[in-house]
Design a protein with these regions (language model features):
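Non-catalytic interaction/regulatory modules that flank or connect domains
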Residues: 60-67, 79
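Short glycine/threonine-rich catalytic loop with a Thr-x-Gly-x-Asp
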Residues: 42-50
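Active-site/ligand-binding loops adjacent to catalytic centers
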Residues: 1-43, 83-183
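Glycine-rich beta-alpha junction loops
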Residues: 6-11, 50, 74-79
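Buried hydrophobic packing segments
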Residues: 51-59
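Short hydrophobic alpha-helical module
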Residues: 6, 58-61
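A short acidic (Asp/Glu
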Residues: 55, 81-84
Length: 183
């Protein structure tokens, strides 16, 4: 097990690189990224970009090669962050090729293996216990529920067995709010 920290500056600046026209132009013309790949980068939002960066750090840390595979989840999409891109453009100025070069070099190509920790049993338990505040004090869960997550070997498999019911609730929510109608 491992914990990997990603700086918000990395994922937010890459959000601009992947979604502003000058960033896409830089990736295509200077880096040589295929146009089809560039168009798919908008599938990644801030969290998805952070997940991708975790994979890069993980691969560098373990000195993986082209023969290895690392997978992650695109947990969100850039479509959720158009207003954030506008805010960043307002705060940092219009996005240009020089900014794209900086962002590529510093926030993607320059990813380092700092802020990572291979976890021992006690490290994992210490991180697990950080849930106390958010789960018990904020969400009203019990300490017994937190311990159940740690000690009950069936807790997470039982949770995954609820996927169909959770999907049904998500679909009902989406229908009720009309959230998908505007996408």
């Amino acid at each position: 097990d491992m914990v990997i920290d990603i700086d918000d500056e990395d994922s937010q600046n890459l959000l601009r690189l992947f979604n502003c026209e000058e960033g896409k132009k830089y990736l295509k013309e200077v880096v040589g990224v295929p146009a089809e790949t560039i168009e798919k980068l908008s599938f990644l939002g801030i969290s998805g970009i952070a997940n991708m960066l975790c994979c890069i750090k993980f691969a560098k840390y373990y000195e993986l090669t082209e023969d290895d595979v690392v997978a992650t989840v695109a947990t969100d999409s850039a479509i959720m962050y158009t207003s954030r891109i506008d805010e960043l453009n307002e705060q940092q100025g219009a996005y240009d090729m020089l900014t794209a070069a900086r962002d590529y070099s510093e926030h993607l190509h320059g990813v380092r293996t700092d802020s990572m920790l291979e976890l021992s049993y006690q490290d994992r338990k210490r991180i697990h216990n950080l849930k106390y505040y958010t789960w018990v004090e904020q969400q009203g869960k019990t300490y017994e529920e937190i311990n159940q997550q740690w000690y009950d070997t069936h807790y997470w498999t039982d949770m995954h067995a609820q996927a169909d019911e959770l999907d049904k609730l998500i679909n009902e929510f989406n229908d009720a709010t009309g959230v998908l109608a505007n996408m």
